[in-house]
């Protein structure tokens, strides 16, 4: 059967828990702009007004107590599993080089110029619908190897037209997406982007190129930049491959944020690795970031933000999920499954179950959505 792409009835309860827990800005999981291109099982798709009532309920719940709720909008490009999609598209017909990934993805078809224009339009349409539904902002997903990230990367974008070649041409797509969203939502509606600091791959998107994108978006008036990094092939967004010095400092991408801050004044958010009030306060006091992005700590404790704001010397209990079976422990999908089930518990009005087993969580999620689909479940930041 085709995947269910409607907003489920339970996000209001989940996002209400975070709003009541003191979080000032919640950014949704990625909402897709085209139901023909799904990145993960159960993606919500917003391309028309058919589910506006559910979206309005979601927005109302997530905005309780003055919380901002921004919709993250996305297109997966070639990171669209074959189990969910008949074909995949990308800037160029470049397949994954990793043989483990090749088994789960089609070789992508290169987008035509007309199709690129349609995707730009779709980003704008989804943003306008999010505003109509009551969300207080939107975020372009320009990181983690999805379509916007693919256009930016010379490893994946080998076009020879106005959208490829030079770094300036490769950032044309993201700038057109931003301009179209801004045109549709107006100047007073927050628009942000989640952007890779780098792809961490040979021949990929570099830090210097990323800084140039930041400067171009800043000149256009973007409201917030969230810094992340990595792709399916080099998943730094999950904390893999980080140096010990980086782990001690907590935030994965703080050094890059300091470079950004030296060039632009746009507000920055760093997500990934923050665990303690002390580490967050240090990052803010250093001026490297303006907002602290949290993910896994808010799954274990939806009220963690309230504890921080109350002045408690709070440290999140986030820790690696281990079974003792090396092959299982090295698979990022086990931790993704574990946190997915905790989110489902919160959405049902239950407390997170911190002592839930990793292997049992993996098997349960595999049973619910199918093993093949699970294999390509998204790696989530921290």
Residue map of PLM features:
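Flavin-dependent oxidoreductase catalytic cores
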Residues: 1-382
